[in-house]
């Protein structure tokens, strides 16, 4: 908590540079979409009484250009150094599918609770297929010392999903779902 406000770290997945740029598909780049969504979540959370730190502060920001591993460790370090109350990493899925899924760190009951409320609210706002809540050992979930989740918004390489990801209205729907889920997790009403 910072000044009595929960501190949330939003992690727009991947980097702008050649190291760890993420998936591409349907004319979209994951690093652009994740930043666009996270930058829309931030003011919604701030309006609802949260302090928000972003791991990337602009579209062309790079968390680390050394390696994918260094980038993942640095993202967790940002959250740990900020003494965050919650960490959410935002991603786009790829590989031919459809829908939204949210991950939590293996055997973390509070992570599962967070992932469940994020998933439910995002699916409700966006209306894509509910692929469920799943456990995983992703580095950003493993190395963060607070409740954490990783959201795979939709499939960037599937036309219907990409249409949602690439549109302003779709990005705003993701942002509302994420912000509503975080508010619900902390027992706050979304305003």
Positions of predicted regions on the chain:
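A generic structural signal for alpha->beta connector loops
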Residues: 49, 99, 129-130, 145-147
């Amino acid at each position: 908590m910072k000044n009595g406000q929960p501190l949330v770290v939003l992690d727009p997945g991947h980097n702008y540079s050649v190291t760890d740029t993420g998936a591409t598909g349907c004319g979209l780049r994951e690093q652009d979409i994740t930043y666009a969504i996270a930058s829309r979540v931030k003011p919604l959370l701030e309006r609802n009484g949260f302090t928000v730190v972003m791991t990337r502060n602009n579209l062309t920001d790079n968390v680390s250009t050394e390696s994918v591993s260094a980038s993942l460790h640095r993202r967790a370090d940002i959250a740990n150094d900020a003494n965050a109350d919650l960490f959410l990493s935002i991603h786009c899925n790829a590989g031919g599918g459809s829908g939204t899924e949210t991950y939590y760190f293996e055997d973390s009951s509070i992570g599962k609770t967070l992932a469940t409320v994020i998933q439910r609210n995002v699916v409700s706002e966006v209306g894509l297929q509910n692929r469920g809540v799943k456990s995983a050992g992703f580095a950003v979930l493993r190395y963060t010392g607070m409740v954490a989740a990783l959201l795979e918004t939709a499939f960037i390489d599937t036309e219907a999903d990409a249409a949602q990801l690439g549109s302003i209205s779709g990005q705003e729907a993701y942002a509302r779902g994420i912000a509503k889920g975080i508010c619900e997790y902390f027992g706050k009403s979304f305003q």
